[in-house]
Curated annotation (Swiss-Prot):
Protein family according to the UniProt entry: Belongs to the G-protein coupled receptor 1 family.
Domain of life: Eukaryota
Protein name (record): P2Y purinoceptor 1
Organism: Bos taurus
BP terms from Gene Ontology: cellular response to purine-containing compound; establishment of localization in cell; monoatomic ion transport; phospholipase C-activating G protein-coupled receptor signaling pathway; platelet activation; positive regulation of monoatomic ion transport; regulation of cell shape; relaxation of muscle
Entry-listed glycosylation sites: N11, N27, N113, N197
Membrane protein topology class: Multi-pass membrane protein
């Protein structure tokens, strides 16, 4: 099953171009339009696969991400105090992931509803804004975690003052400010648009009207909040691996946690972040510059691959809790202790309720004068 769609048109624009028989929407019943027509524009062909892949991935991410990050936040708040510097970064990473997974039910419904958005323009903007805040917030907090571990492994004595919790708190506040300010243009670029068949789309990028300026903005954020952090992370990990090879850390917990950190973070980048940014850039270029009849089939393949990477980009919310468990400071040990304590408390409560029930039964028998017991 395939669905051929003309590009959606943004809400609230002039209808003059829409009435033009030469426009893609010329004979449609749509009541709004994009700004300026191009000589030729490829019609987007969506396959049935795209309607089911993303909601399936989002359901998986919501279930695993909600449970994993809920447990992580519970652990950091109630069982990990006093926090170390790396715990501060991991808590903020868990918080960013948790806020993102809370937005997924609306997206899941959107795709099961044949990509017809019913929640309004403001909710669409908020949805896309939170996705990008999570995406780049996660990247920057992973960079902070990597730099923190690098300082602890390569310069264990010199970095004692720099690795204090207070400094980590200041850096975390700065990261949130950078991300929120840097991503705030998404609130302008994203939004809803009306398709030819009167269904409403929620742009994951922007409408054709603002596409060229959005491409420039997207490249700036990609360089500043993806490429630069990736270079820093690779540099940190290269020096960490070198230090682990030349230092006598064969059986130390620091060596084990550092190795886990390198493996998990590089896996997240290789699976989630790198494919997403590559295909997002290619998709934007295709929409801008590859609008010829010969390129339409290629554009469809680029768009389909981009949709796959959108699902992969959300998987980091599932993987990050594994990072806390394997690479965090005493997280696994304290989680085990907390679950044992909760289990003992549950057993004690159950035993107490059982004893209370027995006493109540005996009391009722005595009040009724029954001495058969």
């Amino acid at each position: 099953m395939t669905e051929v769609l003309w590009p959606a048109v943004p809400n609230g624009t002039d209808t003059a171009f829409l009435a033009d028989p030469g426009s893609p929407w010329g004979n449609s019943t749509v009541t709004s339009t994009a700004a300026v027509a191009s000589p030729f524009k490829c019609a987007l062909t969506k396959t049935g696969f795209q309607f089911y892949y993303l909601p399936a991935v989002y359901i998986l991410v919501f279930i695993i991400g909600f449970l994993g990050n809920s447990v992580a936040i519970w652990m950091f708040v109630f069982h990990m105090k006093p926090w170390s510097g790396i715990s501060v970064y991991m808590f903020n990473l868990a918080l960013a992931d948790f806020l993102y997974v809370l937005t997924l039910p609306a997206l899941i419904f959107y795709y099961f509803n044949k990509t017809d958005w019913i929640f309004g323009d403001a909710m669409c903007k908020l949805q896309r804004f939170i996705f990008h805040v999570n995406l780049y917030g996660s990247i920057l907090f992973l960079t902070c975690i990597s730099a923190h571990r690098y300082s602890g492994v390569v310069y264990p004595l010199k970095s004692l003052g720099r690795l204090k919790k207070k400094n980590a708190v200041y850096i975390s506040v700065l990261v949130w400010l950078i991300v929120v300010v840097g991503i705030s243009p998404i609130l302008f670029y994203s939004g809803t648009g009306i398709r030819k068949n009167k269904t409403i789309t929620c742009y994951d990028t922007t409408s054709d009207e603002y596409l060229r300026s959005y491409f420039i903005y997207s490249m700036c954020t990609t360089v500043a909040m993806f490429c630069v952090p990736l270079v820093l992370i690779l540099g940190c990990y290269g020096l960490i691996v070198r230090a682990l090879i030349y230092k006598d850390l064969d059986n130390s917990p620091l060596r084990r946690k550092s190795i886990y950190l390198v493996i998990i973070v590089l896996t997240v980048f290789a699976v989630s972040y790198i494919p997403f940014h590559v295909m997002k850039t290619m998709n934007l270029r295709a929409r801008l510059d590859f609008q010829t009849p010969e390129m339409c089939a290629f554009n469809d393949r680029v768009y389909a691959t981009y949709q796959v990477t959108r699902g992969l980009a959300s998987l980091n919310s599932c993987v990050d809790p594994i990072l806390y468990f394997l690479a965090g400071d005493t997280f696994r040990r304290r989680l085990s202790r907390a679950t044992r304590k909760a289990s003992r408390r549950s057993e004690a409560n159950l035993q107490s309720k059982s004893e209370d029930m027995t006493l109540n039964i005996l009391s009722e028998f005595k009040q009724n004068g029954d001495t058969s017991l």
